[in-house]
Design a protein with these regions (language model features):
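Intrinsically disordered, low-complexity regulatory regions
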Residues: 1-108
Length: 108
């Protein structure tokens, strides 16, 4: 099992990129993976289930994730430091990933 750049046993996975990214996508994707991994160590994820799981399972995932994307996008640059604004963008992307996961699981 790979966890973005590493196998589960913490053996490095060889990452070779022949693409000359113009917008630092490779660096940003690595940072995004580190951010997402860090959210799994936060206090609200220490329980057996996260609140997000209940929301998705109850059929409210699309509204929840899109609502959070809008919330953090509108908050961008208006709260805290420049680094706080950057974290808001990471949250937008993370909720976008959860929205994609939910979209793929829905059977509409």
């Amino acid at each position: 099992m790979k966890i973005f750049g590493k196998e589960k046993e913490d053996k490095p996975v060889k990452e070779e990129s022949l693409i000359d990214y113009k917008y630092s996508e490779d660096r940003i994707l690595k940072e995004l993976a580190e951010y997402i991994n860090s959210t799994y160590n936060q206090h609200y994820s220490q329980n057996k289930f996260q609140a997000t799981e209940f929301i998705l399972d109850s059929g409210h995932g699309t509204g929840f994730t899109i609502g959070n994307i809008l919330k953090y996008a509108q908050r961008y640059g208006k709260k805290g430091s420049r680094e706080d604004a950057r974290k808001d963008l990471l949250k937008v992307i993370h909720y976008g990933i959860i929205a994609l996961h939910n979209h793929d699981k829905e059977k509409i």
